[in-house]
Curated annotation (Swiss-Prot):
InterPro entries: Membr_insert_YidC (IPR019998), Membr_insert_YidC_N (IPR028053), YidC/ALB3/OXA1/COX18 (IPR001708), YidC/Oxa/ALB_C (IPR028055), YidC_ALB_C (IPR047196), YidC_periplasmic_sf (IPR038221). Coiled coil: none annotated. GO terms for biological process: protein insertion into membrane; protein transport. Belongs to the OXA1/ALB3/YidC family. Type 1 subfamily. It is a multi-pass membrane protein. The gene is yidC. The keyword Transmembrane helix applies. GO terms for cellular component: plasma membrane. Keywords: Cell inner membrane, Cell membrane, Chaperone, Membrane, Protein transport, Transmembrane, Transmembrane helix, Transport. It comes from Coxiella burnetii (strain RSA 493 / Nine Mile phase I). This is Membrane protein insertase YidC. Required for the insertion and/or proper folding and/or complex formation of integral membrane proteins into the membrane. Involved in integration of membrane proteins that insert both dependently and independently of the Sec translocase complex, as well as at least some lipoproteins. Aids folding of multispanning membrane proteins. One of its GO terms (molecular function) is membrane insertase activity. Interacts with the Sec translocase complex via SecD. Specifically interacts with transmembrane segments of nascent integral membrane proteins during membrane integration. The lineage of its organism: Bacteria, Pseudomonadati, Pseudomonadota, Gammaproteobacteria, Legionellales. The chain crosses the membrane at residues 3-23, 346-366, 369-389, 436-456, 509-529.
Length: 566
């Protein structure tokens, strides 16, 4: 095995280490929730934690004080409305009409807890994460409305495709407000509509604000790995996708205007996002940080619509859309341009999207994500076969040149310049590119990285089974069988590869599979499955190239001879 293959494996190993670091950074071990003790309210109702006030630009000091007090308050269950569809379980507080809880019944927290759905929004103080909306007055101050509804429970029944939850109330300035949430079957997008009726004798001015309020979630450090990204993001026609980490929001608030766009809070596999109702209007996007002394800070991100002017006796309407659910590109792309970029495929996003499209097309046929990974990997290796074959043959040519290079070393001794000139002349004469063995393989590295992100970021692979003992491709193999098979596949690859006369290089190449096996123990099973398939196909390709190398070389010589005759 020549030194170039060792260099190539070292490069791949370093990439794997970087990817593993990224995995630990983005998805550290899930911290245990802090237990909370609920205190009974004065009226005996069972309380639910919640933060009512809304925060909009222009009232920094007031909102800081109000927010600090509100985060420790409770709201009785008597104020809650429950809404259940086939994909969402939602709680709405009639004070303000905000969504204070959202669960996803089709996404259990784990295979061991199938009856416990993933909860995106929560009103608990230690994990505060709510979707707020309301009206501001002419001075930009939010107004809190106590709403009423016809029912306390709304359920999307069989045969229904739409569920409407209508709230009515009167603002402190006498305005009659109707707030309507519309839910649809198999849809995580919630349509919000505000209707304002000015029954007063004075004109009214105000705007719609929508925002997401979230306490920074707890994180854990894993050895030397830095913590994950779990924060805000936004998009606009100018910048389709922009991450807004908690650290950046601490340093500077968002304060910008844009037509259309969106604002969101992300986490692994899921997100919540507000999308303006009219893409032709200009909205003001903002953020606000509420410091906390004993707990993580609370972050507010949102937007305000253009001001509405409602004459006395007149009406006006405005609307927006809230998405609370999984990061599925097809769903997100239909809501707002760039929202699908919240599926964090990294800087190779276009390649990752293409690979996911292929993976999905294969899955539509085989109905198993594990087999889809295997088949997609085989297709990738077929597409890149020309590069692999060129690399294998180039390395074979370099090995053939080793005796002649050794002779040059003996002839020129310590004269490095003369040795370099003689070596390059030999390469030129024999038409050998010294980098020909590495470059074709390196071209494939971006595809490996892109496919890595597809496997770890696509919610479709979350809790997706393969065969036998693999019940979840997004987590490590519980019995470490796949990493062992991966190590054996690397040993098979070494077996079909021509060996180097250097005993040190031979030992290095046989040690690498052991190192990689240990290294891949904690990787997601889907990623290890991809690596196994890649190794097996590459081993077969190298075996075929080795078998046909002499005939290929003879054809090449004959072709060159014909060219010289011309």
């Amino acid at each position: 095995m020549d030194i170039k293959r060792i260099i190539l494996y070292v490069i791949v190993a370093l990439l794997a280490i970087a990817l593993f670091n990224a995995w630990q950074r983005d998805y550290p071990p899930t911290p245990k929730p802090t237990p909370t003790v609920e205190q009974p309210t004065a009226n005996g109702d069972h309380p639910t934690a919640y933060t009512p006030p809304a925060f909009t630009p222009g009232a920094a000091e007031k909102t800081k004080k109000a927010g600090t007090i509100a985060f420790t308050s409770k709201v009785p269950e008597a104020r809650l409305i429950t809404v259940r569809t086939d994909v969402l379980d939602v709680e709405i507080d009639t004070q303000g009409g905000n969504i204070v809880s959202a669960k996803l019944p089709k996404y259990p927290v784990s295979l061991e807890e199938k009856q416990t759905p993933v909860q995106i929004l929560s009103g608990e103080p230690n994990e505060l994460y709510i979707a707020q909306s309301g009206l501001t007055n002419g001075n930009g101050q939010p107004t809190t409305v106590q709403f009423e509804s016809e029912k306390k429970q709304y359920v999307l029944e069989n045969g229904q495709n739409q569920l409407i939850v209508q709230l009515t109330g009167r603002a402190p300035d006498g305005l009659l407000v109707t707030k309507t949430y519309t839910f649809h079957r198999d849809d995580y997008a919630i349509h919000l509509a505000y209707q304002v009726k000015n029954n007063t004798s004075k004109p009214w001015q105000g705007s719609l604000y929508t925002q997401i309020t979230r306490r920074q979630p707890p994180t854990e450090h894993h050895h030397f790995y830095v913590r994950s990204y779990n924060g805000a993001s936004m998009g606009s026609p100018q910048t389709p996708y922009e991450k807004l980490s908690y650290e950046s929001l601490d340093k500077q608030n968002i304060d910008r205007t844009s037509q259309s766009g969106w604002i969101a809070m992300q986490q692994h596999y899921f997100l919540s996002a507000w999308v303006p109702g009219n893409p032709e209007l200009t909205y003001h996007y903002y953020s606000h940080v509420i410091p906390a002394s004993d707990e993580p800070n609370v972050y507010v991100v949102g937007f305000v619509s253009p001001q509405m002017n409602v004459a006395a006796g007149s009406e006006a309407a405005t609307h927006a859309t809230l998405y609370v659910g999984p990061e599925i590109a097809k769903r997100l792309k239909g809501l707002a341009p760039g929202l699908e970029r919240t599926i964090d495929y990294g800087w190779l996003w276009p390649i990752s999207m293409l690979l996911f499209w292929i993976l999905s097309a294969v899955h539509a046929v085989v109905k198993n994500w594990g087999w889809s990974i295997i088949i997609t990997t085989i297709l990738i290796k077929i597409v890149f076969y020309w590069f692999s074959a060129k690399s294998f043959r180039s390395m074979a040519r370099m090995r053939e040149m080793q005796p002649r290079i050794q002779a040059l070393k003996e002839r020129h001794g310590d004269d490095r310049q003369a040795l370099s000139r003689a070596t390059m002349e030999l390469y030129r004469k024999e038409k050998i590119n010294p980098l020909g063995g590495c470059l074709p393989m390196l071209i494939q590295v971006p595809v490996f990285i892109a496919f890595y992100y597809v496997i770890i970021e696509s919610v479709q692979l979350r809790q997706a089974p393969f065969i036998f003992w693999i019940h979840d491709l997004s987590v490590k193999d519980p019995y470490y069988i796949l990493p062992i098979i991966m190590g054996l596949s690397m040993l098979a690859q070494q077996w079909v590869s021509p060996t180097s006369p250097d005993p040190t290089q031979q030992k290095m190449m046989w040690i690498l599979p052991v190192i990689f096996t240990v290294f891949f123990i904690n990787f997601p099973a889907g990623l290890v499955l991809y690596w196994i398939t890649n190794n097996v196909v590459q081993t077969l390709q190298q075996w075929y190239v080795n078998k046909t190398y002499e005939s290929h070389k003879a054809k090449l010589k004959a072709r060159r001879a014909r060219k010289r005759k011309r």
